[in-house]
């Protein structure tokens, strides 16, 4: 009787397993087996995401990896609507302006370019014909477009796209006391959704995030020390006013933006054709006809 019962139980378990069907294909590069990776690249139509964050101070109340934590939350939710392969954690961006703060990891400009180029080259070698860099860090907004532009220096068999920003949702009058640019209401609201256990609301008032306005130059004149001149505490805004509801609204807008970007990149066939044409012509500029 015992053997019969065990046999029936085993058969039942097997039937349940069969009924579950094939396992869902992960989107994260590091979670795929080698065979699954081949399937994932096919399913993604060769489209891979490279979410980029940074390690830097985020006021007195948010973790150093806030940018990476938030951008990965967004991309991981976006690919449930439009599948793409997500590259593992990447925080090797531009953050020279925060080198004076504990915990900041600031690589040289040369290292940033070399490492990102090597990374996208390896992604391309592994079948990523379209690499969509999803930026989660404001300090990368000049670096990443320049990197994309630099892809015209030499031929590549993949195309780099850069996505940054979204239609941020802010409460009326949110910036009446000054800019809300770093670890303030918006970013803190996002963290209350993505990682509430790492968000220390009781510390948000421990430092000032006010604009110090220590250098006054025309808007069309740039100097590298501008951020430190305005926000020496590496804090811009007031995180104490953050709410989870605001974070949910803002993150959904961000997710929607990334979904649209993935779909647009998948549909784009012209960039590769034109890039290939450009490489061929740039090798023989004297033969370019007009």
Give the location of each predicted region.
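Bacterial N-terminal signal peptides
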Residues: 5-16
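Extended, histidine- and acidic-residue-enriched regions that form the cofactor-binding/catalytic faces
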Residues: 20-110, 114-132, 138-290
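N-terminal secretory signal peptides that target proteins for export/translocation
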Residues: 1-2
